[in-house]
Swiss-Prot record:
One of its GO terms (cellular component) is cytosol. GO terms for molecular function: arginine-tRNA ligase activity; ATP binding; glycine-tRNA ligase activity. Tetramer of two alpha and two beta subunits. Pfam families: DALR_1, tRNA_synt_2f. NCBIfam families: glyS. This is Glycine--tRNA ligase beta subunit. It comes from Bacillus subtilis (strain 168). Keywords: Aminoacyl-tRNA synthetase, ATP-binding, Cytoplasm, Ligase, Nucleotide-binding, Protein biosynthesis. InterPro entries: DALR_anticod-bd, Gly-tRNA-synth_bsu, Gly-tRNA-synth_heterodimer. Belongs to the class-II aminoacyl-tRNA synthetase family.
Length: 679
């Protein structure tokens, strides 16, 4: 079958860098999905993007759809043929419905029953006759943010300026918002000009001639190579932030790296401020020496060539100098502050219109933190540190520096607190109470920081739940899922055996059930990330108490034992107790009502297991705890072999069920064994 290459390029006004890659991938997925849907075979797919274009190249696209041959099944033979062997109306109707004649029908047996069948054949259409449908594919792309322009109804990420659509050397004809498809694309805005693409395979090279590097991976490698060359030539170290590298890559069509300098006196400003100014505000790469100390230089990437590059460097230096001068001023002004005066200013900042001011939040956090510290048996000095850290945790939010650099909240707070004489533990906690700042991020390194972080996150979650702001689907505007995951991460990192139920006693809430379910889902998410089996997760989360540290370690022990010899039988015995216990109620067990020795032996085994489990759990020895439960298997099996739990005598029945309920409670303190899938 003959084949042709396919090229589709959407030319746009400059797109936001953060949306570029996912938009390119979406276009590629939609195009290959369309080809598959249309039964059009193809070869290699290559994706391109720049701030002004999204493009897909598909090699060896078939010039014709595959023919479709399939067998259609009709009515059963006994319905399709009458007594004389003639086709019935049912058979005739089936053949017409399939576009066939009755002469094409045949009988075939399926699972012992004979049915009427017909072979269907649909000849494939020429690909070029279908390709104009790509206009709908282009307009179907979804973006996080859209706009309208002119009098057009189409909402799109940016106005469409040109479209290149080629199948082989032929243009695929269609139009979108009065833009006709063609073969003309645009080169670099300043260094290139219009160019007519000869064929899809020539696309990348022809654009390169117009100072456009269409392949984002090639652009990225160019930037990395230029950074490495500069570092080697100047004996520098350039710590490359992958997110920044990707963003810069998606801001340019033809990258040329250059470096500039700033006055060394600016190095007296905290490094975090300098780095944030360069990376977040200017998209510059900071420069360090081989010892990791910041140098008064930066690297930026120009969208163009090296023409007049010294002037470009001077211009960037001027912009950075102005920003650093502002930062220096803010830093000096903030050193005049009084922490307690700043805390009072929090009264004038609204946390949320239904939840009061930031000062109100700080008071709630302080109360929770003190209760939590007492629960964790903190000494008197540590309690004072926790209280003070919670009270001043938000003081830096009213500083000049955080007004300008909100991403440095906590970080600058720690520096200012230390500078103004706060205890080291208190200063560190001002920063650490925001940790972890992202999923999988660093957790607080100090006890005080961990306690205040837990309190702050717990208050945020409980407060928003109290006013009905509960995450649903993809909607989580206040990042409550991240906050809950942060609480779980801290509990696991600090080995604190505090259950969700106990945590909720530290806050005032009427949404306890909703909060427990929410925290359980976040714990399930964390356990999934640890590659724990789904049935094991369900088993431990159905235990009597939801406590992250024990849940993780119980799950890990269960996973290790699942394939062990005899574990299947043990799990079945323990699960049998849980199942039958559902028919009873919790009550006192009366040994004088035992009718055989096996009831007594199981009662003794239960008491031993209960005592052992208390000791195992207090030592956090979950392997020993599972062994304590495994020791119940034989007395459980013997009990069921010789005892009818659902006895005719109501007193005996109630006593035996009470024994099952008590035993099930101990088993479920580890896990619900019935949730396990053991083979």
């Amino acid at each position: 079958m003959s084949k042709q290459d396919l090229l589709l390029e959407i030319g746009l006004e400059e797109m936001p860098a953060r949306f570029l890659n996912e938009s390119m991938v979406q276009l590629g997925d939609k195009l290959t999905g369309w080809l598959k849907e249309k039964n059009i075979t193809h070869g290699e797919v290559k994706l391109f993007n720049t701030p002004r274009r999204l493009a897909v190249f598909v090699k060896d696209v078939a010039e014709k759809q595959d023919d479709i041959k399939e067998e259609a099944k009709g009515p059963a033979k006994k319905i399709a043929l009458d007594a004389d062997g003639n086709w019935t109306k049912a058979a005739i109707g089936f053949s017409k419905g399939q576009g066939a004649n009755v002469e094409d029908l045949y009988i075939k047996e399926v699972k012992g029953i004979e049915y009427v069948f017909v072979q269907k054949f649909q000849a494939g259409q020429e690909t070029k006759s279908l390709l104009p449908e790509l206009s709908g594919l282009i307009t179907s792309l979804h973006f996080p943010k859209n706009m309208r322009w002119g009098n057009e109804d189409l909402r799109y990420i940016r106005p469409i300026k040109w479209i290149v659509a080629l199948f082989g050397q032929d243009v695929i004809p269609f139009s979108i918002t009065n833009v006709e498809s063609g073969r003309t694309t645009q080169g670099h805005r300043f260094l290139g000009h219009e160019v007519s693409i000869e064929s899809p395979s020539a696309y990348e090279e022809q654009l390169k001639g117009q100072h456009v590097i269409a392949d984002p991976s090639v652009r990225k490698q160019m930037i990395q190579s230029q950074l490495e060359t500069m570092a080697a030539e100047n004996n520098w170290s350039i710590p490359v932030d992958e997110d920044l590298l990707d963003e810069v890559n998606h801001l340019v069509e033809y990258p040329t790296a250059l470096y500039g300098s700033f006055e060394s006196e600016f190095l007296s400003i905290p490094e975090e401020v300098l780095v944030t100014t360069m990376k977040e505000h200017q998209r510059y790469f900071p420069v360090k020496d081989k010892n990791g100390d910041l140098l008064p230089h930066f690297i930026t990437v120009r969208n163009g060539n090296s023409h007049a590059i010294e002037n470009v460097a001077r211009g960037n230096e001027k912009v950075l100098r102005a920003r650093l001068s502002d930062a220096s001023f803010f830093y000096k002004e903030d050193q005049k502050l009084n922490i307690d005066a700043n805390v009072k200013k929090l009264e004038n900042i609204v946390f949320h219109e239904e939840l009061g001011s930031l000062a109100d939040k700080v008071r709630r956090v302080t109360s929770i933190a003190e209760k939590l510290a007492v629960r964790l048996q903190a000494d008197e000095d540590t309690l004072k540190h926790v209280k003070r850290a919670a009270e001043i945790s938000k003081f830096d939010l009213v500083t000049h520096m955080i007004y300008e650099f909100p991403e440095l909240q906590g970080i600058m707070g720690e520096k200012y607190a230390r500078m103004l004489g706060e205890d080291e533990a208190v200063a560190a906690a001002v920063n650490e109470h925001y940790m972890p700042r992202s999923a999988g991020g660093e957790t607080p390194s100090t006890f005080t920081g961990a306690v205040v972080a837990m309190a702050d996150k717990l208050d945020t979650i409980a407060s928003f739940f109290s006013i009905g702001v509960i995450p649903t689907g993809s909607q989580d505007p206040y990042g409550l899922r991240r906050q809950a995951s942060g609480i779980v991460a801290i509990l696991l990192d600090r080995n604190w055996g505090i259950s969700f139920e106990e945590l909720l006693t530290f806050v005032q809430t009427d949404k306890e059930n909703e909060l427990l379910d929410f925290f359980t889902q976040r714990l399930k998410y964390v356990l999934n990330a640890e590659q724990i089996r789904h049935d094991v997760i369900d088993a431990v989360l159905e235990s009597s108490e939801l406590e992250p540290y024990s849940a993780l370690h119980k799950a890990q022990v269960l996973e290790q034992k699942l394939g062990a010899p005899g574990f299947k039988e043990t799990a079945e015995a323990l699960g049998r107790v849980i199942s039958i216990s559902k028919k009873g109620v919790r009550g006192d067990i009366q040994p004088d009502l035992f009718e055989n020795e096996y009831e007594a032996k199981l009662f003794d085994a239960y008491q031993t297991a209960k005592q052992n489990l208390q000791e195992n759990f207090s030592k956090k020895d979950y392997e020993a705890a599972l062994a304590s439960l495994a020791a119940l298997k034989e007395p459980i099996d013997a009990y069921f072999d010789h005892t009818m739990v659902i006895a005719d005598n109501e007193s005996l029945k109630a006593n035996r069920l009470a024994q099952m309920v008590s035993l099930a409670d101990e088993i479920k303190s580890f896990a619900n064994m019935n949730a396990l899938i053991v083979k």
